[in-house]
Design a protein with these regions (language model features):
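Positions that flank functional sites
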Residues: 42-43, 88, 123
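Acidic carboxylate-rich catalytic motifs and surrounding loops in phosphoryl-/glycosyl-chemistry enzymes
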Residues: 15-17, 117-123
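Catalytic grooves of carbohydrate-active enzymes
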Residues: 4, 56-120
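Active-site-proximal flexible loops/turns
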Residues: 21-23, 124-127
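Accessory recognition modules or surfaces
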Residues: 80, 125-132
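Catalytic domains of cell-wall/extracellular-matrix polysaccharide-remodeling enzymes
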Residues: 1-68, 72, 96, 100
């Protein structure tokens, strides 16, 4: 990939279709800071950096549950990785509409939760100040 992207340093990896194995996790954890699977959920406390959880914005996503998801994230002091395959007016079963993406981003922003790239969120999670 370096011949295409130059000096870009890739720090995260997403398992294709969520195909994860112990061998893949072992190999990829040496190549990337974090890897994301397709297991649904909020990332909290002890993070499995070789298989972070995510929330899929796809045909099955219930936009009415976003407030509950945000509330749970705040209560658990966690962070969410949202992913989708395409953003278009008539998305594939794995994508979402621009309106849904906007609604989710607006709800998260309005809640006061920071919106960050994965590597920045990881930095916050790994190097947050110790509180007493």
């Amino acid at each position: 990939v370096k011949h295409l992207l130059g000096d870009v340093i890739m720090t995260s990896f997403a398992y294709p279709q969520g195909n994860v194995s112990i061998g893949a996790k072992r190999f990829l954890s040496r190549k990337f800071s974090v890897c994301r699977g397709t297991q649904a959920g909020i990332n909290t406390k002890l993070l499995e950096l070789s298989q972070l959880k995510c929330v899929n914005l796809d045909a099955n996503f219930d936009k009415n549950s976003i407030d509950a998801l945000i509330k749970e994230t705040k209560v658990r002091n966690g962070w969410i990785i949202f992913n989708t395959h395409d953003v278009i007016d008539f998305p594939s079963p794995y994508g979402c509409t621009p309106e849904l993406l906007y609604a989710v981003v607006a709800a998260v922003a309005a809640s006061g939760i920071e919106i960050l790239p994965i590597k920045h969120a990881l930095g916050r999670a790994m190097f947050r100040p110790i509180t007493r």
